[in-house]
Amino acid sequence: MKRTFQPSKIRRKRTHGFRARMATKNGRKVLAARRRKGRKALIP
């Protein structure tokens, strides 16, 4: 059985990147929540 995590920089950026977050209303809510909490990095 293969491992489930097959890293890809492109896929990571496209699904979890800053622009992906900004593209949807809920994504912007995520960023706002992370700013409110005082996260050092908004995008992991």
Swiss-Prot record:
Cellular component annotations (GO), alphabetically ordered: ribonucleoprotein complex; ribosome
Keyword line: Ribonucleoprotein, Ribosomal protein
Single GO molecular function: structural constituent of ribosome
InterPro entries: Ribosomal_bL34 (IPR000271), Ribosomal_bL34_CS (IPR020939)
PANTHER family in UniProt: LARGE RIBOSOMAL SUBUNIT PROTEIN BL34M, MITOCHONDRIAL RIBOSOMAL PROTEIN 34 FAMILY MEMBER
NCBIfam families: rpmH_bact (TIGR01030)
HAMAP family cross-referenced by the UniProt entry: Ribosomal_bL34
Protein name in UniProt: Large ribosomal subunit protein bL34
Xref: Gene3D superfamilies: 1.10.287.3980
GO BP term, pick one: translation
Family, per entry: Belongs to the bacterial ribosomal protein bL34 family.
